[in-house]
Amino acid sequence: MDEKEKELQLAEEKKIEENVKEYGTDKIPSMSDRIALITIIGQVEGHNVLPPQTKSTKYEHCIPQLVSIETNDKIEGVFIILNTVGGDVEAGLAIAEMIRSISKPTVSLVIGGSHSIGVPLATAANYSFISPSATMIIHPVRMNGLVIGAPQTFEYFNKMQERISDFIVRTSKMEKDTLKRLMMQTDELLNDMGTILIGEQAVELGLIDEVGGISDALNKLESLINLKAENVNLNDDGKEDDK
């Protein structure tokens, strides 16, 4: 066995070792080079590092990945899978705005749940899906740590809430009045304000486009890629524009 074969064998063994460590199996089928996969899981980490036992999505990982996707001519579409409890507002909105500004077709799929700042992350794609049993919690913004009891604090909270609400309304079919009503609900969550939406409810209220799974989402992404190849402009619903 020559040096080149040894290097290839070592690289293959290292890859198998990493797969076993990360996924619990030695064989992981590779994703199509045409479609980039982004997973947003656990808690969206902000400027403070979360404890090591907390599953998290780091914006400093997502942003370079999104830039790489945008500049890579081989990638034709982006598939985003979400199962997140929410997290940092600034980091979540930064990732959501990056997803929204990508020129390539994007489709999101909510599995398990996409709560709090996970809501705009789900609606940021051109077209969104939610699995039948998945949930989405809409609630007002909240803060940990020191809070100063002054009118300016309320104004700051209000402005932050407006940023989130405006993004959701801009990227979904939900009316702003409906969104505000769901956020201020007091009889649904224990010791909290807000509303929990399950599968079809999110679609009925215009937050998510369709109930479906992986095959539905990938089929939709393929159709958007084909429309893009035909130079058809897509509107905010991921549908063909009449113009």
State each model region's role.
Residues 1-109, 113-119, 124-139, 143-243:
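N-terminal organellar transit peptides
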